Amino acid sequence: PHLSLADARNLHLAAQGLLNKPRRRASLEDIPATISRMSLLQIDTINIVARSPYLVLFSRLGNYPAQWLDESLARGELMEYWAHEACFMPRSDFRLIRHRMLAPEKMGWKYKDAWMQEHEAEIAQLIQHIHDKGPVRSAD
């Protein structure tokens, strides 16, 4: 079997949800569903027109209220994790990455034991903050 260049492009665009325009108005449930389809959504703070995650969702859903992303996170449908970079991921994927959470030293230079020891006090403060205030976003 041979795939033409045009077919390969269309296959890639379709897999990313970019081949066709949205057929209906977006709903709140489309936010976690779209991120699930992509596997993750990088949290990028670049803000020329809008923050990157909002533009990525707009390109797939069309016009939608930007607060839906925060609402999906607050409802526990999404979680933040360092998957590739800082990313939003479907909470249902937690079981797929838990092994990485348990072995952060295998995630590269950012998680070396020496770094963890050097920042032990800050890490303890962060854990205490989460303990006192409950689940929080990285922005908190």
Residue ranges and their predicted role:
Residues 1-140:
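Phosphate-backbone binding and catalysis cores of DNA-processing enzymes
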